[in-house]
Amino acid sequence: MTQDEMKFAVAQAALKHVVKDTIIGVGTGSTTNFFIDALAKIKNEIKGAIASSKATRQRLESYDIKVFDLNEVETISVYIDGADESDDGLNLIKGGGGALMREKIVAAVANQFICIADESKLVTIMGDFPLPVEVIPMASNYVKYQISQRIGGTPTVRENFITDNGNLILDIKDLKITNPKVMETKLNSITGVVANGLFANRGADILLLGTSNGVKIVTRLIG
């Protein structure tokens, strides 16, 4: 299977986790786009969706899928999104597309988080993919310094990119993330950080992993 064929396969598999007659959360990225395309075929079975980015909203609306504002709803049955990296514990790095803050909010509200990815995203130790951190623009230099001193790695400002919230993204290279929950909490404690791309304190519940042998289902171990 090619990478796109794996993404297509997990997108189709994710449809089985869509709860009928509810509002679902939809993430951002290339794999999620495959899911939106698949979702269009069963759009009449759901009430609508919450989009994690402007790009996702546009794609959903192009299929006439109703998009709700998060403040209009009380619950989201399931959140379906991709990942840039995942470890065996279903801790994730996300935010390659720059939508990490909104993705975190929607994931926090959802009853269940289903991650869809191809097999190249599953790693033993995360960090080869640069870790995105959304920062207030006026604090970018301060945050870069604090990351270098307190976290390590090499943070750089993502060029020519502004988030949907009007902020900057720092991408941290040269990390080996052995304790994702601790690093997520430490990054969030730096003044000026809006959010970081570690989804560990609220990781995925289920990973649908596209492989050359089909879709593998990986479940988060509790405890």
Curated annotation (Swiss-Prot):
The lineage of its organism: Bacteria, Pseudomonadati, Pseudomonadota, Gammaproteobacteria, Candidatus Pseudothioglobaceae. The active site is at 103 (proton acceptor). It catalyses: aldehydo-D-ribose 5-phosphate = D-ribulose 5-phosphate. Its EC number is 5.3.1.6. GO terms for biological process: D-ribose metabolic process; pentose-phosphate shunt, non-oxidative branch. CDD domains: RPI_A (cd01398). The keyword Repeat does not apply. Belongs to the ribose 5-phosphate isomerase family. Homodimer. This is Ribose-5-phosphate isomerase A. The keyword Cell division does not apply. Catalyzes the reversible conversion of ribose-5-phosphate to ribulose 5-phosphate. It comes from the Bacteria. GO terms for cellular component: cytosol. InterPro entries: NagB/RpiA_transferase-like (IPR037171), Ribose5P_isomerase_typA_subgr (IPR020672), Ribose5P_isomerase_type_A (IPR004788). Pathway: Carbohydrate degradation; pentose phosphate pathway; D-ribose 5-phosphate from D-ribulose 5-phosphate (non-oxidative stage): step 1/1. One of its GO terms (molecular function) is ribose-5-phosphate isomerase activity. It is an enzyme of class 5 (isomerase).
